[in-house]
Amino acid sequence: EVCRKTDIDTKRFKERMLLSVISSAKNEMILPEEFELNAGGDFVQLKIAKVYKEYEAQMRANNALDFDDLLVKTVQLLETQPDVRENYQERFRYIMVDEYQDTNTVQFRLVSLLAGKYRNLCVVGDDDQSIYKFRGANIRNILDFEKEFSDAKVIKLEQNYRSVGNVLEVANSVIRNNKGRKEKTLWTDNEKGEKIRLRQFDTAYDEAQFIAEDIKDETAQGANYSDHAVLYRTNAQSRLLEEKFVAMNIPYKIVGGINFYSR
């Protein structure tokens, strides 16, 4: 309906793309008027600005809010209504935010408003684990925390209790190359452990084949199947691994999920 009213070619401007841009703008507290000003003379941005404005008009007409509005409208309410802000500052005197490196601008504004009176704010995060920029996360929230809250006390949690020394040495050598980070060095009292081996493969098929064969070789030399674990980033990656395990009669169990073909 919005695209029809704004004469948008949905073959060129996909609805999902338009909604994503609008969502990103709201995460930055950029409302339709400001979005249009920022567009300048850019044809594409002006088209999106037109859609954004109509989208908001349709939302108002239907007395509706989208997910991003739940934060945007809350921030606007707290900024413009001192009595409401005072009420919630009294209600939430102590605030803790986890995974702070993944917060966006509107979330930062909300936390700042709520903590503005008593300043009892504790945030926990790791700038080296910031991976959600594509989803609107603003790394400056954690990097500039001491500037925004000058009386803050920073506690670095650099000791690792889970990993062996060699794992941390590799981790430090990798994250040291990150841009925009707070300097830190992970360390442990644990043993050095086995050296890390790095193998790269041309295809996911080759990778799964190598892993399955490696497990077979280890068990042939006396190791147990239960001595092995395979970590993967996304659930879809388990398919090829499971195929290889089944083909080579390797017993396995999916932890924290279900077998690929049972989904």
Where are these regions (language model features)?
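Conserved motor-region signature of P-loop NTPase helicases/translocases
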Residues: 16, 90, 96-97, 101-263
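A basic/glycine-biased coupling hinge at the interface between accessory DNA-binding modules
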Residues: 1-94, 119, 139, 195, ...
